[in-house]
Structure formats: C-alpha cells, structure tokens
Amino acid sequence: MLKLIDITWLYHHLPMRFTLAVERGEQVAILGPSGAGKSTLLNLIAGFLAPASGTLLIAGEDHTLTPPSRRPVSMLFQENNLFSHLNVQQNIGLGLNPGLTLNASQREKRDAIARQMGIESLMTRLPGELSGGQRQRVALARCLVREQPVLLLDEPFSALDPALRQEMLTLVSDICRERQLTLLMVSHSVEDAARIAPRSIVVADGRIAWQGKTDELLSGQASASALLGIKSHIL
C-alpha cells in the first residue's frame, strides 16, 4: 500500500532519509526522541514537505511529487485546525467540498461519519463551544469523510486526559480495521502505541533506527528500547 524508497529531505543540509513499506490495513506507530524526524516523515508522506530525492508509492502509484490535496492521504494534527467561524457540520463538510456545496450523497456521508463519531447532536455548534475531545472528534470526522486509504496521525490526542485518549485510540483503531485503512501514528508514548499498533518504527537522527513488534519495545527487549528510555524487565 505505502512504500518509501530512499525518500530524502535536507534539514540544514543534513539529510533525513527514510525507506519503509506498510501493507494495506496495517496500524503502525512511529516513535522516537524529540526532534528525531517523526513528524518530518509524516509530512513527507502527506506531501507538506518536498523530498530532495527518492520515491513514494501509494497503492503502486508514484505520488512523490503529487500535491497534498491530491494525495490519497488524510492527516490529523495535535492542533485540530478547525475553522472557528464554521459550525461542526460545515467543518466536516470541508472534507468533501471546500466550497461547502454538498450534494445529497455527500450530505449523507457527512451525517453518517458524524453519527459514527458520536457528534451528530453537535452539528450546529461552533468549535469554541466544544470540549477538546469533541473538537478532535470533529477533526477526525473531517479526515475520515474524505475516504482516503491512508490515515496519518501526528499526536492528535496527546493533550487529552488518559481515559479520553484511550477512548479515541480505540475508536480510530476500530474504524481503520472496519475500513481497512493504513494507519501511521506518531506518538511519544509506547503504551499508546501498544494499544492499537502491533508494529512500531523507531526514528532517530533522521533515520528509521528500528522496526518490529511494539510488544518487544515495551518489554525492553528490543535494541531500540533504550532510545525510548525503556529498560528490560528481565533480571
């Protein structure tokens, strides 16, 4: 589904280089120290950064130079980027038509995803009238209504309390399984990663330093566990 072949981005003339393959329907966590290049990796996949070299394939098609708006990718950030002057219904509708002129089929898609997110009763409210968790549900609905096969999450739930964060992670995981979406999620928490991502990638110094089973990282048995401050539990 998603393949990066020597995708390179120059940061102050220092190259960050990524080679990666992710299958359709996989849920993968991207972990690593601050400043390691995790968000850079997502931004390269989404098209917000242009690589200096390399190839990016999605579903077998070359999207290395495809503009972000035309890539089969949706991305959710920590800052939800909702438009404060538009209500929930309109913010979700932007995912279908920037001009907000929706046909009957598009309106049904908008309303269906709102029901799935549990926000159908909030459609006439403005973002400022919502809680943090509700705003992230709206932002997630706007991503999902686009029906793109790849979903990128850049720590969108890190500001939420632990119980709400787990609820949102479970919701995302369930939807990705239901729709067979390919998910890549940046997180600082290996515990969060373990909840939804069987496989993890550890980024360090602009490279993929390790990839494998998330449980191995969490147990401290992986070679990259130390990069995340995780010690082995075996005496």
Swiss-Prot record:
Keywords: ATP-binding, Cell inner membrane, Cell membrane, Membrane, Nucleotide-binding, Translocase, Transport
SUPFAM superfamilies with a match to the protein in the record: P-loop containing nucleoside triphosphate hydrolases (SSF52540)
Gene of this entry: thiQ
Entry's localization field: Cell inner membrane
Domain ABC transporter positions: 2-230
Membrane topology: Peripheral membrane protein
Taxonomic lineage from the root: Bacteria, Pseudomonadati, Pseudomonadota, Gammaproteobacteria, Enterobacterales
EC nos: 7.6.2.15
Annotated source species: Salmonella paratyphi A (strain ATCC 9150 / SARB42)
Catalyzed reactions per annotation: thiamine(out) + ATP + H2O = thiamine(in) + ADP + phosphate + H(+)
GO cellular component, one term: plasma membrane
Pfam families for the chain: ABC_tran
Binding partners and assembly: The complex is composed of two ATP-binding proteins (ThiQ), two transmembrane proteins (ThiP) and a solute-binding protein (ThiB).
Main location: membrane
Protein name from the UniProt record: Thiamine import ATP-binding protein ThiQ
InterPro entries with a match to the protein in the record: AAA+_ATPase, ABC_SmlMolc_Importer, ABC_transporter-like_ATP-bd, ABC_transporter-like_CS, P-loop_NTPase, Thiamine_ABC_ThiQ
Similarity section: Belongs to the ABC transporter superfamily. Thiamine importer (TC 3.A.1.19.1) family.
Segments passing through the bilayer: none
Domain of life according to the entry: Bacteria
Regions annotated as coiled coil: none
Record function comment: Part of the ABC transporter complex ThiBPQ involved in thiamine import. Responsible for energy coupling to the transport system.
PROSITE patterns according to UniProt: ABC_TRANSPORTER_1, ABC_TRANSPORTER_2, THIQ
A GO molecular function held by the record: ATP hydrolysis activity
Residues reported in the UniProt entry to bind ATP: G32, P33, S34, G35, A36, G37, K38, S39
